[in-house]
């Protein structure tokens, strides 16, 4: 991971200076406040440096010679990339020193607060530990659904039904999972983005078949639904829905449902009901508890 990867993702940021391709190690931007005050913790910088309004106002109080000295001390730490927000003009001394010390610089019209959020999220996803799972990933009613199960149970066919119902397709077969700020983000490997394999039909391009508006690059995984062949001797299925079951992905617990596949059951409809019910449960509503309360009221009468 170096400045080229950041610029590729944020291609609307202007490349002001092309420098060395030093590896970015940290998933957090640094504002170099301590370094500007001549307090140096590290001998080199391995994080993306972000300068905005605060840094600009700080440097503005000094004469040109002292400003040059302060910036030069930062650049001597060879940061892998410096990003300038809309409040920090990319001109003069900065560009001269960037060329001298072989530092890459990007400038943008974004605010420092937005930049911090965008870049930190991007770096966290790219640098975080990954887990690869087999399944399909669809977004329903704003929630990401990881559909799992053995081959031949109709995951892809179910995904097609859900897309036709207006839901979003993210990935088929291979799901790349990342822990981003304790949220599991799922996406397709780049080379498979937008493609869906259907048994008996082959590979289809979901964006071409269903429309580009039905395909999304990534989503948070909010629920795991596993499809299994119906066998009461092997599996125990939830009947009352009193409590949520969970499975872990990269240390994060995610609501989990085990759904039996039986003749005549339309799986896509079941999944829509599950997601709608889960949204209610996450908002504090529980159908079983309401039924239990009404049963107690009837007993009192």
UniProtKB/Swiss-Prot annotation:
The gene is hprK. It catalyses: [HPr protein]-L-serine + ATP = [HPr protein]-O-phospho-L-serine + ADP + H(+); [HPr protein]-O-phospho-L-serine + phosphate + H(+) = [HPr protein]-L-serine + diphosphate. Residues 260-265 are annotated as: Important for the catalytic mechanism of dephosphorylation. Belongs to the HPrK/P family. Residues 196-205 are annotated as: Important for the catalytic mechanism of both phosphorylation and dephosphorylation. Keywords: ATP-binding, Carbohydrate metabolism, Kinase, Magnesium, Metal-binding, Multifunctional enzyme, Nucleotide-binding, Serine/threonine-protein kinase, Transferase. Homohexamer. It comes from Malacoplasma penetrans (strain HF-2) (Mycoplasma penetrans). This is HPr kinase/phosphorylase.
